[in-house]
Every structure is written in structure tokens, then in C-alpha cells.
């Protein structure tokens, strides 16, 4: 099959409607996150950014749980989505296990928030305030873990309108509550960064109630159906997929937390890095992650076709996104200074430009990872993570001990970028091997 024919068929079968729905679900949180960053920029000094940025290492820990539990659902529930009873059972039992694990994690954070904040080399003047903020954030985080679970189910059921609704509710409530708790408006309580935690908790509770109600109606479930006998026998298959996904995330995030996040705290650039990351993940990658989620869904079913017909559209759209990044560079400074309300915008944009080539590689890398998730081949993710992080960050540690590597904002960014580049090489080789094993069928 020629390249032109494969590309034409691939774009023809691409689920534009679901992609649009997923894109909107990504746009909406970005809007309230941007408003939130703008409000933080009005707090005198940089302590607001610095304290809020410390949730990053907590999120890295939570990401391990999420990638071990939530992302494998594309495969574990995707293979039974046509079976009502089995789907209900997997959602019911899966949410129970997820909630239990998040609660355990929350208790650990509540008990050791201060010690962990000190270990991450946060400014001593803000350790107490940071620990308090992190403890408050765990309420909303635990509630929203259940929402994430149900969003995966809604994606598999192609319930676009309810994906819109969930994020719409989250945006409206978050902006309204941030304005009341955080902003410098006349009616605001002006609670500082803690206002973010209160907003997240209330918004997460409201969206969770909506998501559970929608799923119950879709499956014609009453309250008693949620309490009926739970069959946990499928946990073995969930564990088989999730253990490698979790291992991948654990290795990747522990190295990132120590060598990137902690080092940024040491050189006192955590606020700069947090805003730059917010711009990259909130805006540059905005249209990309819905694309990756759609590819997970597209490759999770039992029916296979030629990989060119299935994936060319995804890689083509990713290429267009990368071109748009380059075209919009002249406008980044204005956006960061005016919209994100960051005074040190030149340093932030400079950091983003250093990372840009690596994030172009990252975009293709993540699409290949999405195929691994969709096919339940998470052991490949674990292998690439171990190889990449041990080789790159292990080398950096040796060079640091030899006084060859000196941590600065630029060198830390280049270290992170090198990790992405090496990971991309490893991922491509494994993706090629997967295609050979499947005779090019996905």
C-alpha cells in the first residue's frame, strides 16, 4: 500500500468527533489553570509560585499510582466494554481499589508532608506553608482520581457529551471558586495558595457526583447495584498490565523528582520552571494529549488493521502541531508576560526554547507509548524507562560527583532534554520490534 493511499485511509478513519471532544476536555482545564496562574502572579513576591510549584513532586508520586491503575484501564475495560455486567463489575471494583490506594497515599502525605518538603530542598521560609497547602490538596486529588477513572470509561463508551459536561463543570466551578478564594478582587477571601486547594476539593466533589450519576443512568444502575457482590477475579489481569506501567512511571518519576525538581529547588528556580512547565504542558501540548488518548482507545480493541492505515493520521497531526509551535514562537513572550502574568517572562521563554526540540521528539515518543498501552504491552514501557533513566541520570550523577556537571537552570533543562532524546531512541526501537512481531498489524 502506497504512502498516499495509507495516509488517505488513515485520515478517513480518524475519529475526529471523539478527538474534538477530548481536545475540549483538555482546553477547559487549561483555561482555569491559566486563570489560576494569573491570580498567583498578583501575590506579592514569588512565594505564591514557589509554594504552588511544590505540588509537582506530589503529582509525580501520584502519577505512579495513576499510571499503574488508571491508564491500563484502556486495555482492561476496553476488552469487555461491550459486556454490560462485566463492565459494571470492573468499574465498581476498580473504583473501590483505586479509592483505597489513594486514601493510603493521602494518609502518608498528611503524616510526612513537612519532612518530604524539607527533603525536596524547598526554601526554609516557606516549608510550613508548603506542607499545609500540600495536605489540603490531597482532598481534591483523591476525589478527582475517581473522576479520572470514569473519564476513561466514558472515552471507551464514546460518551462525548458527558466528557464535555464534566470538564465544563470543573472549569466553571474552579474559576468561580478561585475568584472567591484566591484572586485580588474586592469580594475575594484572598486565602493565597490554600485557596487553590479549597477550589480543587469542591470542584472535584461536584464533578465526581455528576460522573457517577451519568454512569449509573447509562448502565441502568440503582444505588443498590453499587453495593452488590463485587467480583475481583479480574484484578490479576489488571495487575499484569499495571505492574509494568507503574514500574515505568516509578522509575521515570523518581529520577525526575531527584534530578530535575529537587535540583530546581536547590538553584532556587522552582517558580520559573513551574511556569515554563505550565506553558508547555498547558498550551503547547494542549492538542497533543487528547491525540495520544485517542490512539490508546483506537489500538485497544480486538480488531487489527495495517499499522500505516491506523497510525499515519496520528503522526501527521502531531507533525502539524510541532510546526505550529515553531510558527508561534514570536508570540510566546507576550503570552507569558500578559496572560500568565509572569514578570520574569524572558527567562521562562528562554527555558521553553531550550526544551522545544526535545518536546518535538517527545510528541512522537508518546504516540508510540500509546500503542504500547493500547496493546497491553506495558512491559516495554518499563524496560525503556529503566534503560533511559539509569543511563542518563546515572551518568549525570557520576559527572556531578566528579565536578564536571554543575546544576544551573540551563544545564538541568538540558539534562532533562537528554533523557527525552535517549528515551525516544529506545522507544522507537521497541515500537519497530512490536510491528515486526505483529506483522505490521495494530
Q: Where on the chain are the PLM-derived regions?
A:
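Short membrane-interface helical motifs at transmembrane helix boundaries
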Residues: 104-135, 322-349
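Alpha-helical transmembrane segments of multi-pass membrane proteins
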Residues: 111, 124-150, 280-283, 342-368
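Helix-terminus/linker motif at the lipid-water interface of multi-pass membrane proteins
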Residues: 30-51, 117-124, 180-191, 250-283, ...
